[in-house]
């Protein structure tokens, strides 16, 4: 069994950075992509959403980050974790974290502690504890449940808004 950790980072210019793996010779291969979400309205007022290459991004743009992991080994793999920080100069868009067969948790302390949204606590301006807002999340963690067979892939994703 292997435990994999992928870190997805973006510079303030939102260029997709490198992945960091928990093991040097891992049977898990990761690929990462960042895409800009655009909305189009047709002549009848129907809105559709599509994804494009990042290109130029401006405040208010929505970016979708996707990490795909593939078992290139010869054995089943379990205990796969994917950890992604929310890039600087962005805010996480609530309920946008996705991943089949995964359990998702969040952090508000730069990845030191993870919990479900209802359990994330912050100190408010009045000094009282309150539940953290999605835009206050600093990191996202997916735990892949089950086993990943040789040749099988999985993916996780989340959206942010550029500040």
Q: Residues of each region from the PLM?
A:
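Bacterial N-terminal signal peptides
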Residues: 7-16
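Exported/extracytosolic protein signature
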Residues: 2-6, 20-163
